Regions:
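Generic recognition of cysteine residues
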Residues: 39, 47, 53, 127-128, ...
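Alpha-helical rod/repeat scaffolding segments in eukaryotic adaptors/tethers
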Residues: 6, 32, 36, 77-81, ...
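Membrane-targeting and insertion segments and their boundary/processing signals
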Residues: 1, 33, 37, 61, ...
Length: 244
């Protein structure tokens, strides 16, 4: 049995967080295994996103909100105070690191090697050695040396990525997966409290995937048959988590 998890953000902020988390995951993979020039694609995507928007303000507000919420939980009986204090400390450390960091990615803009590659990478087939001889030279270095370079570049984004990954971890933890069924491939739900993220876990043996839409209080899930590329009329068993 193979189950896949699909996630749908219900506001633009969480959408941005998920994109940054996805790139963070790709970059971590590039740090552990040699992917040659492909390691630059998630790095440049991060540069692009952080150029467009300074996420610092939203992230700091969310960190503070979660610190206040977790601090209130400490006053409740029968809670794991050790775990809650650990989360609060992680949030405080992330907040301090983000507050004291320079604008995310600003130093990479001044890196001549990175800047030259960035200008070319958007062009089809632009990684040829006659277009980027400096890349050809860098790729010929031992993997350990390139790994150090990559880590140095990635570290410039960690003050932002670390708290975002933690915030998404906390958001996902607000709801557990519950067994649900979609009759004729459709399910609709609502919530009395604002939602941030819908998570659907479905077994691939059912031959379909969900398309999820909605806003903070209402959402709909349609299941699409992968082979027929149309809405399925079957009853689909799945697991649902609605995270706030």
């Amino acid at each position: 049995m193979t189950e896949l998890i699909y996630e749908q953000p219900l506001n633009e902020k969480i959408r941005s967080y998920l994109r940054l988390e996805y790139l963070s995951t790709q970059i971590q993979s590039n740090l552990t295994q040699d992917h040659q020039h492909r390691c630059f694609y998630p790095l440049f995507s991060l540069c692009e996103l952080t150029d467009r928007c300074d996420y610092r303000s939203d992230v700091l507000k969310d960190i503070e909100r979660h610190i206040i919420m977790l601090s209130k939980w400490l006053e409740l009986p029968h809670v794991d105070k050790v775990q809650i204090n650990e989360l609060i400390n992680r949030l405080i450390q992330s907040k301090a690191q983000l507050q004291t960091s320079d604008r995310i990615g600003v130093h990479l803009k001044k890196d001549k090697f990175i800047s030259a590659l960035r200008q070319r990478f958007g062009m089809p087939g632009a990684c040829c050695n006659f277009d980027l001889p400096q890349l050809h030279f860098w790729l010929a270095k031992p993997w350990k040396e390139r790994q150090i370079d990559l880590q140095c570049w990635v570290d410039q984004f960690q003050p932002l990525l670390t708290p975002i990954n933690l915030l998404l971890e906390l958001i996902r933890s607000t709801a557990e997966f519950c067994p649900t069924e979609a009759k004729a491939g459709f399910y609709q739900g609502d919530s009395g409290q604002p939602l941030a993220l819908i998570r659907v876990k479905v077994d691939v043996s059912q031959g379909c995937y969900p398309t999820i839409s909605g806003h903070r209080n209402r959402y709909a899930i349609h299941f699409v048959d992968f082979d027929q590329l149309r809405h399925t009329d079957k009853t689909i068993q799945f697991l649902l988590a609605t995270c706030s």
